[in-house]
Amino acid sequence: MSDFSFSPFESISGYILQPLNNVMNTTVSGLSSAISAPLNLASIIFIFLYGYNVMTGRVALSMNSLLNNVVKIVIVTTMATNADTFNTYVKNIFFGDLANAIGNALNSNPSSANVFDYILLKTSARYQEVLAAAWFLEKIMVGLLGSLMIMAVIVFCIGGFIVQMFAQVALVMIIGLGPLFISLYLFNATRKFTDAWITTLVNFTILQVLVIMLGTIMCKIILYVLDGTYESIYFLFPPVVVISIVGAILFRALPGIASALSSGGPYFNAGISSGGQIFTMLSSGAKTGRNAAKSAASTLSGAAGTATKAAKIGGNGRGRF
């Protein structure tokens, strides 16, 4: 498995993203065509009436203000009604170029595989090495601990992959509706919807970038652990499992961090809340186990008392015969 030819996450990503890309292109093209005629007509009427009022002195504005408004209208109309221009300046930048550039800058994998594929396959390869070096009877314990270790890494990779796919699917829906929300910028009453659309677009773009950054960081940490020299899997198992659990918690906190970054505020409660929820889950499990043990103990004590009474009754009965 050292050639990293098996890439499950990369394959699944390809199956998902290709239809999404087609849907986004179709949606952008359809919306641009649908709003082209009414938006161009409204822009022409607005420029004509606004310019007429400025030139006749009915509106106290300078020609510079008129030119600025005309330039804004031309830019918004071009972005909203021209699908090729929209794809060049919005779709390609936020959906592909930005994430790919950051991923290429951070990702130093010696293969072209997805970062989660690289982590999973590297862990599996190291597990095979430790299993091959174990003696015969130890292979059972090595196989058990190695399977648990790989399961922890799989949970970590699946968690990160789900967050990444969530960000990309959300970006497809947001970018697909871009021409409509951009056209709303022309009117003061609907400009707030365009501002909200831009904030949401930046939010999920940051989320996608954070997934790439965290995946790369955790990849380097896990690979640093795996590249060490271990005489037994007992020394390899704890750090890999702990790092995988911490990584899964951090992936769960990424949407909140991205939302805080897009709004300009710090976010320190995500990891604490996630850890608190896990602690609550574990404590609830412990309480459930304790209650089950108490119930079993009370049942056993009740059965023992019943057996004692039955023995006494049986003894009394034999005495009367």
From Swiss-Prot:
Gene Ontology terms describing biological process: protein secretion by the type IV secretion system
UniProt keyword annotations, A-Z: Cell inner membrane, Cell membrane, Membrane, Transmembrane, Transmembrane helix, Transport, Virulence
Residues annotated as transmembrane: 30-50, 59-79, 142-162, 169-189, 206-226, 231-251
Main location: membrane
GO cellular component term, pick one: plasma membrane
Cysteines engaged in disulfide bonds, as pairs: none
Induction note: During the interaction with the intracellular environment of host cells.
Compartment(s) of residence: Cell inner membrane
Membrane topology label: Multi-pass membrane protein
Functional description taken from the UniProt entry: The type IV secretion system VirB/VirD4 is a major virulence determinant for subversion of human endothelial cell (HEC) function. VirB-dependent changes of HEC include massive cytoskeletal rearrangements, a pro-inflammatory activation by nuclear factor NF-kappa-B, inhibition of early and late events of apoptosis, leading to an increased cell survival, and, at high infection doses, a cytostatic or cytotoxic effect, which interferes with a potent VirB-independent mitogenic activity. These changes of HEC require the T4S coupling protein VirD4 and at least one of the effector proteins BepA-G.
Family note: Belongs to the TrbL/VirB6 family.
Protein name: Type IV secretion system protein VirB6
Organism: Bartonella henselae (strain ATCC 49882 / DSM 28221 / CCUG 30454 / Houston 1)
Gene behind this protein: virB6
